[in-house]
Amino acid sequence: YTNVLIMPNTLPALDGQTVSGPEATGAKEVLDAGFDNVIDFLQQYDTAHDVQLPVRYDLCVCASKDRAGHEASDVADWLKYVPGFEDDAKTPAMLTHPITAISDDGSAVTPEILDQVLENVKASDLYLIEHCEHHDTGAVNEGPVSRELGVPGIPEDTELKIVARDIEAARRTGVHVHFQHVSTAISFEAIRRAKAEGLPITCETAPHYLALSDEALLKYGTLAKMNPPLRSEADRKATIAAIADGTVDLLATDHAPHTLAEKELGFLEAPNGIIGLECAYGVCHKVLVDGGFISDERLIELMSVGPAELMGHVPTDVAALVEDYAEPAPTGDDPDGVIAGERDAQPQREGVNRLLDLSRVDDADNVDLVVLNAAEEWTVDPEQFHSKARNTPFGGWQVTGRPLATIIGSQLMFSRL
């Protein structure tokens, strides 16, 4: 390969339901996507801790009971799962799958419980992951496309209102607020100003917001329906600008599997969301790196290092595991230089050859890596996904960059090598 990269692997947001068994489909698609650590939004903590999967996962506690928005969840019900609280009494599973955040993802925290939720965040030393949008009507972005489709629109200020409200809450309380799947230029500008002020604000966006505008609805139909909705082309460009200037701290998939039957119900009835795990790196690399907006290294920071640090994990230090490696000179066993000739005929990587040596780390159980071929061109084929879902607008896309292998705890868990 002309450009093989090694990165520590993690992902901050995998929305899902309870799964079980080491061969669970969800586990396969996580590994295929080049990720090993995810946040899953589940309320059944005891059940979740018993699930055995070949991936690492953290838990996110619901901000409200039953995620209904009427009453804040009770700290007494879940504090024992938070790192730093009653650690001596924790089971190994509880230590392995900690609660690292609070969220009502899918909905913004409602005004009537916001203050109590912020108190819970402070009491547990966690952070608030906020779905920064609130609206009661509408199905797609409000604008020319919604009018052409004859579908009720969602104004862009539905996102800004929650962003502005929660920035003020962070200013008032000192609570760390992390905004999910930000999609509008006006929200990015508000976040940019808040960060310049030194407030504890971070944010993410998703591959579809940097790759698609609401015009994709005309081509892909409900496969491009999501929440927040795809916005205007100007907002898409503003999303890329926010990634390039560092306003965006990380990229997440906002992975939301649905059946094609559900997606065929039409714009008003079809569920929001697309699957994103298995083509996330390729789509982001194609748009951001091939487009000249960021480097390969920065994309790794956005998809790996940043998410790990947000969740309170220390990413594997790849630099500590590599050493310069010199090709051996031809020996008497190759008097005609045949081996050397074959070697010289192979594509040569730029820069210094390096050897990855997992024996150089004392705690091999915590070595989590992904091998990436950043130069591989491939076509997204949903029929080849490990996921049972096929709801993606990226089918048929030509992208570059693909995970070749996923290593968890120094063990090869998935490989295309």
Tell me what each language-model feature is.
Residues Y1-H135:
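Divalent-metal coordination cores built from histidine and acidic residues
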Residues G21, G26, G34-H49, A76-K80, ...:
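Short, electropositive alpha-helical surface patch
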Residues Y1-N3, L11-G34, Q43-R56, D125, ...:
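Active-site gating loops and adjacent loop-to-helix segments of metal-dependent hydrolytic enzymes
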Residues Y57, I102, H131, V177, ...:
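Divalent metal-coordination and catalytic microenvironments
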Residues T379-V399:
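A conserved acidic, glycine/proline-rich C-terminal tail/linker
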Residues A72-L251, T331, N353:
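Histidine/acidic residue-rich metal-binding segments in metalloenzymes
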Residues E148-H176, L223, A244, L250, ...:
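His/Asp/Glu-enriched, well-ordered alpha-helical/loop segment
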